[in-house]
Structure formats: structure tokens, C-alpha cells
């Protein structure tokens, strides 16, 4: 890998991230660095108050303009407004299709599993402004819609429907296939959840970005950010969702329970899991929390974790019988 000309960083979610690139740029590579400033309104802020809206939009606007100035200075090129408008247009369309795919997963039987969700996020995270992402999510939407129309699910018989909280063990997405052999489907995930799409006027794409950033953050805040204010940050990466949205998911996705992965190498994505467990308990919905890692297989004990899932399914079955 060659030496970069400059570095772009962010303090979003992961508390040491802000210092990582700063340390690399000042102590190792000696290159310029720009760190974006996260936006995290308090969970109890009145997001309908125009004064609060203008305060945070001014922060977003200043940060974005500073980043543009930094990039123009480093590259010697001016921002191509037309290209930026095209990127914004593509991202709005791609996000809309992706959101509709997740809405289709409310169907019974569920047409798309978590193992596919965690692989289908890649264009959303890295190619959202490209036409390739629009084409990908449009085709995915059509495929999943056809499955729903035909009543085709991932597994022949769904016994349990779950929500997933946290980052998955990337080295073992087959975990979701194992759950499916037990009749359990993960139908919705909190991490990387795209949220309701926001359409904005792109006459001035920079200001459109500011508005979309604010509206996205506002939506996330109003869905509950009491456990982790960073979830209302506008970045497409999301560590989780709020309590109000979780409550809605229980009914909309007909969830019988939830599974949370407490991952050792990304603490931020584990924040609020006990809080969410308490919220679900009030609704009579059980939730299990298991611990391992998202990238280190040494933290994985296959027999032990599978036994935890088997025990949890017995609890879920008991809850279902009590409700029937």
C-alpha cells in the first residue's frame, strides 16, 4: 500500500477513532488530516424546535464546507457541483430501494435472511453515490418483491422471528443458517439500518446534503436515542436503533424475540443492549445477549454459543405458549 497524500477521519461512534488518524498523520506518515465532527443531539432534545434545528444544521454546514475546503486545498481541484448533485441523486434512489427491501422483510414467511442482509450492505456503505448501487438495490428489491408475492420464504417453516442487535461475527455468518435449521429467522437488524429515506431539493446539493443529514438525524433521535446519542449521527453506519423503533419492530416484523451480540472489539455497538432488553421485557418479548467478537474467531466457542441459542429458543417457545 502506498503512502496517502492526506487522511480523512471521523469521531462517529467509536471513541478512539478521532485520534487514530490524527496519531497516524502526526507521528508516522506526516500527512495532513481532516477529522469530521460528529453530530449527537441529546436524546431528550426537542427536535421540532427550529432553534435546535438551525444550531445543528449550522454545525453540519460548517463541517461540510471545511471538508470541501480541505479537499480542494489538498487536490488543487474545485468541487464539481454537477457531479456532487449526481452522487446525491444516486444515493437518494439507492437508499429508497434499500429501505423498501427491508420493509418487504416484514412479510411472513421472511423472504431474506440476515446472512444476505449483512452482505448486501456493501454498496450502501461504499457505493451509495454510484449508479452501480442504484442498479444493485433496484434488482434486489425486484427479487425480494417477487419472493413475497409468491409467498416464498428463506426456510419452509418459520417457528420464530427475531430482531438482531449489534455487529455480526463476520467470520461466521453461517450462524444465521444454523438458526434457520432450528426454525428461527432473523428478520431485521439494528446495525447498519438505513432508516426512512429522506428526499431533499438538490438545486444546491451541498445545502441538500446538510438538510438530508439533519432530517436523517432527526428521525433517528425521535425513534429513541436514549441509550446511544450517536445513533442520530447522519453517517450511513449506524451502531443501533432507539427504543421507540424497537417497539415498532416488534409488531411490524412480528418478532418473537431478539438476539444481541456483545462484541469485544467494538464496544460502541454493544451500548444500550441491557436497556433494549428491559424495553422488550416490558412487551413480553425475550432477548438474549451472547458475547464473542466480530473478527477474532478465538473468541468463538461454537458448541457453547449454539447451546445458548438452543436454550434461548426454549425460553421463546415458552413465551409463545403463554401468549397463545
What are these regions (language model features)?
Residues 1, 62-85, 214-240, 316-324:
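Extended, charge-rich low-complexity interaction segments
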Residues 1-70:
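Gly/lys/ser-thr-rich phosphate-binding loops in alpha/beta enzymes
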Residues 10-17, 165-172, 264-271:
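Gly/Ser/Thr-rich loops at beta-strand to alpha-helix junctions
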Residues 42-47, 195-202, 298-301:
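Short, charged, surface-exposed secondary-structure boundary motifs
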Residues 57-197, 235:
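A charged, amphipathic alpha-helical module
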Residues 166-238, 242-245:
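Redox- and metal-dependent alpha/beta enzyme cores, enriched for Fe-S-associated oxidoreductases
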Residues 236-284, 288:
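C-terminal hydrophobic structural anchor segments
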Residues 277, 281, 288-324:
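C-terminal regions of proteins
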Amino acid at each position: 500500500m502506498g503512502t496517502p497524500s492526506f487522511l480523512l477521519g471521523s469521531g462517529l461512534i467509536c471513541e478512539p477513532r478521532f485520534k487514530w488518524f490524527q496519531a497516524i498523520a502526526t507521528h508516522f506518515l506526516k500527512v495532513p488530516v481532516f477529522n469530521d465532527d460528529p453530530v449527537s443531539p441529546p436524546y431528550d432534545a426537542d427536535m421540532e424546535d427550529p432553534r435546535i434545528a438551525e444550531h445543528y444544521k449550522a454545525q453540519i454546514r460548517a463541517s461540510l464546507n471545511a471538508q470541501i475546503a480541505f479537499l480542494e486545498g489538498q487536490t488543487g481541484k474545485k468541487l464539481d457541483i454537477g457531479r456532487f448533485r449526481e452522487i446525491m441523486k444516486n444515493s437518494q434512489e439507492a437508499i429508497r430501494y434499500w429501505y423498501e427491501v427491508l420493509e418487504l422483510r416484514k412479510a411472513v414467511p421472511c423472504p431474506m435472511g440476515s446472512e444476505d442482509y449483512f452482505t448486501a450492505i456493501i454498496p450502501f456503505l461504499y457505493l451509495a453515490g454510484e449508479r452501480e448501487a442504484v442498479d444493485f438495490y433496484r434488482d434486489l428489491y425486484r427479487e425480494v418483491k417477487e419472493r413475497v408475492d409468491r409467498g416464498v420464504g428463506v426456510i419452509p417453516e418459520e417457528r420464530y422471528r427475531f430482531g438482531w442487535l449489534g455487529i455480526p461475527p463476520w467470520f461466521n455468518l453461517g450462524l444465521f443458517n444454523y438458526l434457520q435449521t432450528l426454525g428461527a429467522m432473523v428478520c431485521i437488524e439494528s446495525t447498519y439500518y438505513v432508516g426512512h429515506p429522506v428526499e431533499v431539493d438538490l438545486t444546491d446539493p451541498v445545502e441538500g446534503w446538510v438538510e438530508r443529514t439533519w432530517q436523517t438525524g432527526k428521525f433517528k433521535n425521535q425513534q429513541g436515542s436514549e441509550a446511544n446519542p450517536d445513533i442520530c449521527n447522519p453517517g450511513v453506519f449506524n451502531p443501533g436503533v432507539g427504543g421507540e423503533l424497537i417497539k415498532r419492530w416488534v409488531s411490524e416484523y412480528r418478532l418473537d424475540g431478539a438476539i444481541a451480540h456483545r462484541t469485544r472489539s467494538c464496544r460502541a455497538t454493544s451500548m444500550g443492549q441491557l436497556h433494549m432488553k428491559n424495553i422488550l421485557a416490558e412487551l413480553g418479548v425475550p432477548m438474549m445477549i451472547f458475547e464473542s467478537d466480530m473478527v477474532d474467531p478465538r473468541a468463538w466457542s461454537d458448541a457453547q454459543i449454539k447451546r445458548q441459542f438452543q436454550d434461548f429458543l426454549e425460553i421463546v417457545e415458552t413465551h409463545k405458549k403463554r401468549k397463545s
